[in-house]
Regions:
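Nucleic-acid 5′ end/cap handling module spanning
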Residues: 1-75, 79-88
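Acidic, low-complexity intrinsically disordered tails
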Residues: 92-100
């Protein structure tokens, strides 16, 4: 099954040594606050633009699709950022934070 969710964008980093100009998103897990990495969809210029303009996206909410939650930390895996949501709160509630 394909699952989806909304995740806070913590950072946008280079994809790796083979494609350092392409972006990879660092996201906060919606169920426990752990972090995970997720590749964006899009053509080469879109994926480069996320990295070049990362300050415009950090703190926003990403909508991502993924295949499963993996490991002890239950982070989404085998997923992609589908789009950036502009009309969402800039911070999602974290289930681990105590209410004051």
């Amino acid at each position: 099954p394909i699952l989806d969710g909304k995740f806070e964008i913590l950072d946008i980093i280079p994809e790796g040594a083979k494609r350092p100009n392409f972006s990879k998103f660092v996201l906060r897990n919606d169920i426990n606050g752990e972090t995970f990495e997720c590749m964006p969809v899009g053509d080469a210029s879109t994926r480069q633009s996320y990295l070049i303009n990362k300050d415009k996206f950090i703190g926003k909410i990403a909508f991502a699709e993924f295949r499963c939650r993996s490991g002890v930390k239950e982070v989404p895996s085998h997923g992609n950022v589908i789009k950036i949501l502009d009309n969402e709160p800039t911070r999602l509630p974290n289930n681990n934070e105590e209410e004051s």
